[in-house]
């Protein structure tokens, strides 16, 4: 194997590792989707059982949504940093 072929092979391995790392970083988005579904299904269920608790439960649900969505944005940021940095 000559030097040029070895260099190109090393670059292709690095590209594959970078793409694989970005794909693994995006796996967190599946957990975020399940978490958001769980938050809102529980919110709807609790308001259906006790409509008077809606103002208190809705605020907590929105806080849970924001924190869960922050994890998604962080995972997306890491994936973009892996791909383009």
Curated annotation (Swiss-Prot):
Protein name: ATP synthase subunit c
Quaternary assembly: F-type ATPases have 2 components, F(1) - the catalytic core - and F(0) - the membrane proton channel. F(1) has five subunits: alpha(3), beta(3), gamma(1), delta(1), epsilon(1). F(0) has three main subunits: a(1), b(2) and c(10-14). The alpha and beta chains form an alternating ring which encloses part of the gamma chain. F(1) is attached to F(0) by a central stalk formed by the gamma and epsilon chains, while a peripheral stalk is formed by the delta and b chains.
Keyword Calcium (UniProt): no
Free-text function comment from the UniProt entry: F(1)F(0) ATP synthase produces ATP from ADP in the presence of a proton or sodium gradient. F-type ATPases consist of two structural domains, F(1) containing the extramembraneous catalytic core and F(0) containing the membrane proton channel, linked together by a central stalk and a peripheral stalk. During catalysis, ATP synthesis in the catalytic domain of F(1) is coupled via a rotary mechanism of the central stalk subunits to proton translocation. Key component of the F(0) channel; it plays a direct role in translocation across the membrane. A homomeric c-ring of between 10-14 subunits forms the central stalk rotor element with the F(1) delta and epsilon subunits.
Localisation per UniProt entry: Cell inner membrane
UniProt membrane topology term: Multi-pass membrane protein
Transmembrane segments: 20-40, 65-85
Gene for this chain: atpE
Organism listed in the record: Gluconobacter oxydans (strain 621H)
SUPFAM superfamilies given in the database record: F1F0 ATP synthase subunit C
């Amino acid at each position: 194997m000559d030097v040029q072929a070895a260099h190109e092979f090393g670059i292709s391995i690095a590209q594959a590792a970078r793409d694989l790392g970005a794909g693994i970083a995006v796996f967190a988005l599946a957990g975020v989707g399940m978490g958001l579904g769980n938050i809102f299904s529980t919110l709807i269920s609790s308001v259906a059982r006790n409509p008077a608790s809606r103002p208190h439960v809705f605020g907590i649900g929105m806080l849970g949504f924001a924190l869960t969505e922050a994890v998604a944005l962080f995972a997306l940021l890491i994936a973009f940093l892996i791909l383009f940095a």
